[in-house]
């Protein structure tokens, strides 16, 4: 009898084996080839199960997400979040933002800062931002030791140090995921070549903001000869890059570069996204490998706005929703060698975004005021970071205050 009593007492614990279940949503997880209505169970910081029908009785808390899309937490690999510790001394002195201010409300759980800091100031960046943010923040080191202190200072060849940069990247390999070359003005590839050298030494990819398009250093040469497989060309739809041939199709060199394994990142930003390139290439099936924002205080208050808006632009140009999610989750995670991110699978960290695909008539802008229209847009409904609900747009996780079992603070 005593044994039976013990077993009966244990039944509720056995029955409620999950802390949380997101129930009835349409899961899109490109990495694991899931594109169907599924329930997602979570225990602690991890995904515990993904299945067609998890009984509600097995969960302590159930959130109805029927009619919504459940995706891996968005990975934005181009967002400037380093504001510096000395006023006016880095990109952030004027235009970077604190990651938690905008990440979760847009479904983003991981941000990669591409080159706001270099080997001279990265330790401060890690101490003040990376280690304190609730958002997962990763970084690419600028090959210029001063980072984005000023574009003029990024031209100093004596500050482009592959050995020191690679050494720091190896020392912080848990958060440093690449090397960045940016804003190079000279008629040569020195900055890019130094970044590639550092990337080889540290075994990490390189991201290049090509800067000015000079005939002495053709963009075609960079993506077909200078960059390695796995390296990334950001601002990939920035005019006047010669990406479209006379018939409106992808230029042959672009196809060759992709075949080599070079990755193309959106990096929308405040001046680097033009429908004149993006629409014909997207309609031709040349989708970006990664969709990213180039988020900073100017771009977030201009045409770019945020990650869901940027993703919605590609929906409006004809990119299928599954491919938009792929380019915003598993692809960028893989590009920065963090393949464990960007997925919803048993045992994976429970970084999850829940979106509503709103129907209507919507307009979207590029950086010079060009407009397209589309019938859909993504709206963030909920975000979970490591199993915790960190954003809940419509209060789906709450209970009615009049009848719910709520705990009020003691007087």
Please provide the spans of the model-predicted regions.
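Active-site core of metal-dependent hydrolases
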Residues: 178-301
